[in-house]
């Protein structure tokens, strides 16, 4: 069973990087995953909980995804506007972010395709982690922009002469 008593979890909340809803969403996913598919070791559960909760929290801040590469490289980039990168809570989250190099984070997430995959609650595309519903919305926007870019709109000759 998941303990969910990791100190960095309270630090995420304190910094405004997650809400109770984010934590409960991820804990629910992990519990279903453990019951139906595989038992997770405590360190695997902690790793997944951290990154998936952070992703959900970024969506709550208005971002469409979590840029994992940026988070690993510049932890302060995750902070909500007006939050200063100081204090014990920030140091705890920064330490957790830097516990695994970027490539290991990607491998760790890809190792659990029932949680992070095309048909899973979370989708990994390149270095970005999405809640599945937002990954499809972003793709639809990209396709719409590409279609619009291919349409040749007539421009009146007098406008071209100016």
Where are these regions (language model features)?
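Helicase P-loop NTPase motor core of nucleic-acid translocases
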Residues: 1-162
């Amino acid at each position: 069973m998941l303990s969910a008593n990791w100190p960095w979890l309270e630090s995420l909340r304190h910094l405004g990087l997650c809400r109770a809803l984010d934590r409960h969403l991820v804990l629910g996913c992990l519990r279903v995953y453990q019951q139906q598919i595989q038992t997770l070791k405590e360190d695997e559960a902690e790793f997944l909980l951290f990154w998936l909760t952070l992703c959900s929290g970024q969506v709550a801040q208005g971002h469409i995804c979590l840029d994992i590469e940026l988070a690993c490289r510049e932890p302060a980039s995750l902070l909500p506007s007006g939050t200063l990168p100081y204090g014990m809570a920030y140091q705890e989250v920064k330490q957790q972010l830097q516990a695994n190099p970027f490539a290991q984070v990607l491998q760790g997430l890809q190792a659990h395709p029932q949680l992070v995959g095309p048909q899973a609650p979370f989708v990994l595309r390149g270095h970005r982690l999405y809640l599945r519903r937002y990954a499809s919305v972003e793709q639809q926007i990209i396709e719409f922009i590409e279609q619009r870019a291919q349409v040749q709109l007539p421009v009146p000759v007098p406008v071209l002469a100016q």
